[in-house]
């Protein structure tokens, strides 16, 4: 008996399944593969450059934070000895100078809030 099968009105002969490979020029295929490899290496290089920049920026941030922490430790040690560091003194005097300006603008608002709280307490 014949090994050919009838499927959908067409006669199929036994043999390899799927698409037959097109007759591709091997040199072109090899060149495409090389180009793909070049692009892959370029992407990898860019990714590593980005990661190295990220690491160095994080290391710089860590150094800055360590310096800031050391400064705060020094301030605490000075305050434990009863000394007020000049930086803190400058911060405090800067706040005291800005407080009168803020307080004068806050008084009308504070009066309104006091009136509102008094009305709530009375209920």
Curated annotation (Swiss-Prot):
Keyword terms of this UniProt record: Activator, Differentiation, DNA-binding, Nucleus, Phosphoprotein, Transcription, Transcription regulation
CDD domains hit by this protein: bZIP_CREBL2 (cd14709)
Coiled coil (residue ranges): none
Basic residues: compositionally biased ranges: 10-21
The protein's name in its UniProt record: cAMP-responsive element-binding protein-like 2
All residue ranges annotated as the bZIP domain in the record: 23-86
Disulfide bonds: none
A GO CC term attached to the entry: nucleus
Compartment(s) of residence: Nucleus
Record carries keyword Transmembrane helix: no
Chain positions covered by the region annotation Disordered: 1-24, 92-123
Molecular-function annotations in GO: DNA binding; DNA-binding transcription factor activity
Record field: compositional bias (Polar residues): 114-123
Broad class of the protein's primary localization: nucleus
Biological process annotations from GO: cell differentiation; positive regulation of D-glucose import; positive regulation of DNA-templated transcription; positive regulation of fat cell differentiation; positive regulation of lipid biosynthetic process; positive regulation of peptidyl-serine phosphorylation; protein stabilization
Quaternary structure note: Interacts with CREB1; regulates CREB1 phosphorylation, stability and transcriptional activity.
Top-level taxon of the source organism: Eukaryota
């Amino acid at each position: 008996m014949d090994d050919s099968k009838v499927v959908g009105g067409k006669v199929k002969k036994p043999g390899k399944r799927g698409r037959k490979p097109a007759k591709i020029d091997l040199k072109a295929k090899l060149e495409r593969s090389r180009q793909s490899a070049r692009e892959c290496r370029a992407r990898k290089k860019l990714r590593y450059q980005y990661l190295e920049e990220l690491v160095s920026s994080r290391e710089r941030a860590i150094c800055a934070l360590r310096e800031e922490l050391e400064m705060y430790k020094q301030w605490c040690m000075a305050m434990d000895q009863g000394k007020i560091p000049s930086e803190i003194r400058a911060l405090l005097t800067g706040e005291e100078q800005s407080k009168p300006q803020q307080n004068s603008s806050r008084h009308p608002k504070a009066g309104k809030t006091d009136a509102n709280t008094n009305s709530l307490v009375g209920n």
